From Swiss-Prot:
Residues 427-591 form the Helicase C-terminal domain. This is UvrABC system protein B. GO terms for biological process: nucleotide-excision repair; SOS response. NCBIfam families: PRK05298.1, uvrb. The gene is uvrB. The UvrABC repair system catalyzes the recognition and processing of DNA lesions. A damage recognition complex composed of 2 UvrA and 2 UvrB subunits scans DNA for abnormalities. Upon binding of the UvrA(2)B(2) complex to a putative damaged site, the DNA wraps around one UvrB monomer. DNA wrap is dependent on ATP binding by UvrB and probably causes local melting of the DNA helix, facilitating insertion of UvrB beta-hairpin between the DNA strands. Then UvrB probes one DNA strand for the presence of a lesion. Residues 25-178 form the Helicase ATP-binding domain. It is found in: Cytoplasm. A motif (Beta-hairpin) lies at residues 91-114. InterPro entries: Helicase/UvrB_N (IPR006935), Helicase_ATP-bd (IPR014001), Helicase_C-like (IPR001650), P-loop_NTPase (IPR027417), UVR_dom (IPR001943), UVR_dom_sf (IPR036876), UvrB (IPR004807), UvrB_inter (IPR041471). GO terms for cellular component: cytoplasm; excinuclease repair complex. The beta-hairpin motif is involved in DNA binding. It comes from Anaplasma marginale (strain Florida). Residues 593-615 are annotated as: Disordered. Keywords: ATP-binding, Cytoplasm, DNA damage, DNA excision, DNA repair, Excision nuclease, Helicase, Hydrolase, Nucleotide-binding, SOS response.
Length: 651
């Protein structure tokens, strides 16, 4: 068995050795939950990696957004190059859920754009969890959403070894059952046959094909082939073909599920008729019968996840299978930025249920569709393994769970102090932050600026661009892989300034950043709370020149608390440096190969300014409005906007 082994030129230093020992000791003594309070730049990721190495236990790290998950994934890959470090996030670039608006009698079909590259990484994650123990999965909160049963997923795998008796026709039938497509094109999740050779492109790889040669009904050879060059890269003795969908089901189980679906359909249609809802009764019968026929013929159907209760053999109301069910029992769960991630986990269930209720009440889905859902918070609590909450500002829940005790990691290995905080008047803040940015850029550093509204961020970005500054605007509409590219461009100097509304939530790790500008810091609210301010201040804590300017006309309670906590930490850090003769130095961190580069970014290399072409500007604005409508459950308006976008982009 491959063991976890960190590859790094650094050794634990500062508060890291004590934090690592404390967490490992707690895990060894059976502590179910612990909290790591680590300031920005103190090496929390290295501490997590060290805990994994010392305990030799599989781990999942849950982050509150895809950008942070991608950064953690890259860091963990660099620490564990010989181990399986996987990435599991939602594979939707765009997602509009199925919905019904009774007021206008409008049904909206599910509309989604799946990112095939992220789907590949999801399959790689589940495969690793089932095949080995040296696995670290970095995930977003999508890991608590329904996923196929790990038992069925594992049961459906097809092992093949040299010399084994195997009928090629039967193998083709098995591959179709695993949702592989038959064809001559080399694409992931497909297979083809030429003479006595069957070529299969596994669901969990993007850069290799397996060619299986037969001599009669016997496997004669197994070769790994580069799909681009056609060259043989490896000769194998055995392989295991994993399903191309997490919802594949053995034929007997599928037929049993169909029988149960038909029973519920009869009951559902009868209830509608008894209530004199003839339209709804006809609708549910027509839609469900169509799905049943598709499942009988192909093993799947559109929206098959809505029948997951039956496919996984669950009872009504049972928790769904999720990625957590693929984890070994002794796994460690790290909740990164727990002050943000825990509330996200808590909120997932209710929104999903409210939307499905309309579909069920009007005959678009049967009640069993309610079991295709994320875990409730209580279910998540029941299923979580050993947990370590990680944050610079742990929330009330985390501290309650750990009895108010937290392992502190305030001393950075580099000796860096928390940044100096300066308060300036909000009047004239745009001009001042422009001048401060230009001075910072002239010294070779980068700048982060956070505003209160998207409109203000857009206007500031446009103004700075007109003034000749290389600037980009980071916002929620930017796709996952493009967001990672923008952050990489900032570090490389392709851009010098990054503007955003809630930059602290993006998990930005920019050692080159020497200035953070917080506009309208005195406007109390979520974006200017104590927690948010401390997190945002921390963005400048990786550079010895780091400064934070808070633009405010009054000092609010949140500002005062955040600055006092920053000063407390600075005092502790300064005393430690004096006692150990440490001279602070900027964190040295190479710009690693981004996730998008490794899986093939779909982003076109175009100017950051999407507003140069009026037509492009219209489409971008419409896309933003469409996504906002979907988030606000205004699906009718979202569909209208989607249709308008299709009209504008038609050739």
């Amino acid at each position: 068995m491959q063991r976890f082994k960190i590859s790094s030129e650094f050794n634990p230093s500062g508060d890291q050795p004590g934090a690592i020992d404390s967490l490992v000791r707690g895990i060894s003594c059976g502590a179910k939950e612990q909290t790591l309070l680590g300031v920005t730049g103190s090496g929390k990721t290295f501490t997590m990696a060290s805990v994994i190495e010392q305990t030799q236990r599989p781990a999942i790290i849950i982050a509150h957004n895809k950008t942070l998950a991608a950064q953690l994934h890259e860091e963990m890959r660099s620490f564990f190059p010989e181990n399986a470090v996987e990435y599991f996030v939602s594979y939707y670039d765009y997602y509009q859920p199925e919905a019904y608006i009774p007021q206008s009698d409008v049904y909206i079909e599910k509309d989604a754009l799946i990112n095939d590259k992220i789907d590949l990484l999801r399959h790689s994650a589940t495969r690793s969890l089932l095949e080995r123990r040296d696995v670290v999965v970095v995930a977003s909160v999508s890991c608590i959403y329904g996923l196929g049963s790990p038992e069925l997923y594992s049961e459906m795998t097809v092992p093949i070894a040299l010399g084994m008796k195997l009928d090629m026709c039967q193998l083709q039938e098995r591959l179709v059952e695993l949702q592989y497509k038959h064809g001559n094109r080399y694409e992931r999740g497909s297979f083809s046959v030429q003479g006595d050779v069957l070529s299969v492109f596994p669901s969990h790889y993007e850069d290799r094909i397996w060619k299986i040669s037969f001599f009669g009904d016997e496997v004669d050879s197994i070769q790994e082939v580069d799909p681009k060059s056609g060259m043989v890269t490896l000769k194998l003795e055995k392989i295991k073909i994993f399903p191309n969908s997490h919802y594949v089901t053995p034929r007997p189980t599928l037929l049993q599920a169909i029988s149960e679906i038909e029973k519920e359909l009869d009951e559902c249609a009868l209830q509608f008729k008894q209530c004199n809802k003839i339209v709804e009764a006809d609708r549910i019968v027509e839609r469900t019968r169509f799905d049943i026929e598709m499942m009988r013929e192909t093993g799947t159907c559109k929206g098959i996840e809505n029948y997951s209760r039956y496919l996984c053999g669950k009872e009504a109301g049972d928790p769904p299978n999720t990625l957590l069910d693929y984890l070994p029992q002794d796994a460690i769960m790290f909740i990164d930025e727990s002050h943000m991630t825990v509330p996200q986990i808590r909120a997932m269930y209710n929104g999903d249920r409210m939307r499905k209720a309309n579909l069920i009440n009007h005959g678009f889905r049967m009640p069993s569709a309610l079991d295709n859902r994320p875990l409730t918070f209580a279910e998540w609590e029941d299923r979580k393994p050993t947990v370590v909450y990680v944050s610079a500002t742990p929330g009330q829940y985390e501290l309650q769970q750990t009895g108010g005790v937290a392992t502190e990691q305030l001393i950075r290995p580099t000796g860096l102090l928390d940044p100096v905080c300066i308060v300036k008047g909000a009047d004239g803040q745009i001009h001042d932050v422009m001048c401060e940015s230009q001075a910072t850029i002239a010294r070779g550093y980068r700048v982060l600026i956070t505003t209160l509204t998207k409109k203000m961020a857009e206007n500031l970005t446009e103004y700075m661009r007109e003034m000749g500054i290389k600037v980009a605007y980071l916002h929620s509409d930017v796709k996952t892989l493009e967001r990672i590219e923008i952050i990489s461009d900032l570090r490389l100097g392709v851009i010098d300034v990054l503007v955003g509304v809630n930059l602290m939530r993006e998990g930005l790790d920019i050692p080159e950043c020497a200035l953070v500008g917080i506009l309208d810091a005195d406007k109390e609210g979520f974006l200017r709370s104590t927690t948010s301010l401390i997190q945002t201040i921390g963005r400048a804590a990786r550079n010895v020149e780091g400064r934070v300017i808070l633009y405010a006309n009054v000092i609010t309670k949140s500002m005062r608390t955040a600055m006092e906590e920053t000063d407390r930490r600075r005092d502790i850090q300064r005393k430690y440096n004096q006692e150990h003769s440490i001279v602070p130095r900027t964190i040295q961190k190479p710009v690693q190969t981004s996730l998008s580069e490794r899986v093939g970014s779909s982003r076109k290399k175009v100017s950051r300014d999407t507003n140069t072409d009026p037509a492009n500007r219209d489409i971008v604005e419409l896309q933003k409005e469409m996504l906002l409508c979907a988030e606000n459950l205004d699906f009718e308006r979202a569909v209208e906007i989607r249709n308008e976008i299709k009209r504008l982009t038609a050739p």
